[in-house]
Amino acid sequence: MGKDQTIDKSGHPAEDTRSNHAASSAQVRRAAAVFAGTAAALLILCAVLTVIVDPFFHYHAPLKGFPYVVDNQLSQNPGMARNMTYDSIITGSSMTVNFNTNDFREAMGVNALKLSSNGAYPKDIANVLDFAYDEHSKARKASPLTNAFIAIDVAVFTAGPEEVKYPQPTYLYDKSPLNDIPYLLNKDVLLQYVLRPIVEREATDLATVYATTWQTEEYFGKDWVLQGFVPSEVREKEEPKDAYREKTEINLERNILSYVRQHPETEFTFFFPPYSILYWYNVERENHLEATMAQYEQIGETLLKEDNVRVFYFQDMEDVVTDLANYSDYEHYSPAINSYMAACFGTGEHEVHPGGMHEVLDHMRSIVDSFDFETFLAPQ
C-alpha cells in the first residue's frame, strides 16, 4: 500500500469505495431506465390495444368479429351513436332497456340502435340526440336519422335544463384526443373490455343491449314487487295544479323541441311508459295528482303541435298496470310489455292525436279513482 493512499472507516482504500459507489449508482440508473422503458412500453401497448379494439367506439366502428361487451351507457353510448350504422334510435330512461330492436325492424322495417340512459333527465336525452345528429359522424354520413323513439318520464321534467342524472366522462363526449388519457391508459378498460372479451368470447347482442336479462320469473309478480315497495309519506298540502308548468316548459323547449324543429327529416315518437298502479298510489299520497295530470297534458299536447311528432300513452292499459305479474318493481315492466309497445308503434294502437291527451288522462284518472288500493296492499 502506497504511503499516500487513504483508508476509509471500514478499512478499505477510499478509492475502492468511491469506485464501488459509482458502479452501484450506475446499476441503479440502468435499472431505473429499464423500469421506465418497460413501463412506457406497457403503457404504449395498453394505448395501442385500446385504440385498435376501441371498446367504447370512440375512434371507429366495431371491428368485425370482435366480441364487444356493451354494458356502460355513459361511456359507450356516445361512440355507438357516432360510429355504428343505424337509421333510428331508441332512448330515454330504464323504461327503454328491455326493448328488442328486432321488434322495431319487424313492426316498422327500421334499423334501430338502443341508446338507453338510466334515470335520464331531459338533458341526458338531449346529449344522446347531439351524438346521433353529429353530421361529421360515420353514422350520419351513412344515412339520415329517420326515427327517434323516446320515453317520457314526466317526473324528471322538473330537473334543471342543464342537469344530468350522473357525472359524465367528458373525455368521451368531445372529439379532442388531448384529453383521452383516462380512456387509453385505463386498467379497467383494458382488462374488462379488451382482454376479457378475447378470453370469454361472449359478445353483447346489440338487439337487446342493456336489457335486464338476469331478471327471471322469480323477479316478477305481486309478492316480489310488494316486498320492495315503500309507499311515499302522506303530504297534507296539495301541490298547485301549475306547480310543474314552468320547469317543464323550459325542458321541453331546450332539450326536446329544439331537436324536433331542427330535424324535420326525423319522425319523433314519444311515449309515456306504463308504470304500475302503485306509481299512482304514490302520486296520490304525495298529493300532486292534479299537478301531475296537468304536466302530462302539457307535455303531450305541446309535442303534438309539431308535424313530425307522434305520441303514445300506455299508462291507461288497465289490465296491464293493475297486474303486478308484469312488473319487477312498481315502475319497471317485463320485456313482453316492451315488445307490445314496439308493435303498437307500427299499428298505431294507443296513439294520441292532437287534443286527445285530456281523454286518455280522464281514463287514467278513472282507473286510479276506482282502484281499491287498501285491499290490493293488504297482507295476504
Language-model features: locations:
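Short extracytoplasmic
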Residues: 68-95
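Conserved, well-ordered alpha-helix/loop/beta-strand core segments that scaffold catalytic motifs
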Residues: 148, 223-306
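Secreted/periplasmic serine-hydrolase-like ester/acetyl group-modifying domain
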Residues: 151-152, 161-262, 358-380
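C-terminal regions of proteins
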Residues: 297-380
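Hydrophobic membrane-insertion alpha-helices, especially the h-region
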Residues: 33-54
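Alpha-helical transmembrane signal-anchor/signal-peptide segments
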Residues: 52-74
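N-terminal Lys/Arg-rich, disordered targeting/topogenic segments
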Residues: 1-30
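Membrane-embedded segments
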Residues: 91, 95-183
